[in-house]
């Protein structure tokens, strides 16, 4: 497996700490609002990484956290009058529903900041007692001047930092960042009541759930490119100082999602929520669209491109529909190798999808000439099952896929007409059966009689 290491800024061979085991930590969302397409892009990108490693035979341990106490959440509490738990539980539930729609599997462990407080406090205590942190009026801060490797992760220069760090007169240095914010409304600690700073959460969670036994805590730390500085830089600094080891052997970052070629963000007011996109296409089509460009590339969201991407996926589902009732056999070894080789090259999705498109085109051509070639059909079913597990698509029933967007009242009317047609056929009233089929055709509904009954789709 070849991956791109954000720190070395080059592709490298993935050599895990323990052979054929991959320990991965991905920074999850701060849960104060609905998830946007940036969250979707990141989640899909590293879901593809996880699936690829599993397909290569790796045992993968995958952790994604939830930041469930933060300034933005406190602001939401003030605006709504709701409790911290009500807000965060609500948005965690919404986030998980969005991920389910995108076929992004739950992480193996999903720690929250509020359930990791003991570890976070112990970890900050280690930094404070060993001189890596200091206390001022509003909290405990990490002293970046004590870490001679600070900025080695992001490669930034001091003069380029001011726009991305919080300024405070009492800090020893602009780069210093808060580990614990004093606040009488929250949690007890040896330093005083308060709550953890954002940058102090992930290292404690990684230490809790991985406990690396060598110079690295984990194999891969991943997240959006906007997290490289300051978040990941600050995490790496804390781990070096607290435990005298590197946090991760490899760092991977996905590109930005843009709208009109501007970075999408809530602060710019141009966020596009996942739930809004799911009004336009099925979740799997949104997944297919967002993963269709390389994970490291910036992605410009366009509604027309989204709809075109669904049509590309429609074609694969139409092949799946031609294989109804066919059992699996062995996957085409060359197809499996070629598509897995592409994904093993730093998740080269463009090549992988080109291979998939070619397989679909060739399959349709051969089925047109050999519609009863069962051995070939069985290989195709196996190919599509492999694609399902590797790329996270083709989970939906092939007819239900083409029923998306049809409202419930029309579905009910179609069901009644199909029942009437089946009864007419049973009574050998084939003229009436044909009339009902014609009526459905005029409604842009195509029907197909299968061993499992009469199926329909929206044309």
Curated annotation (Swiss-Prot):
GO terms for cellular component: cytosol. It comes from the Bacteria. It is an enzyme of class 6 (ligase). Zn(2+) binds at residues 27, 202, 231, 235. It catalyses: tRNA(Cys) + L-cysteine + ATP = L-cysteinyl-tRNA(Cys) + AMP + diphosphate. Its main location: cytoplasm. A motif ('HIGH' region) lies at residues 29-39. Its cofactor is Zn(2+). HAMAP family: Cys_tRNA_synth (MF_00041). Monomer. This is Cysteine--tRNA ligase.
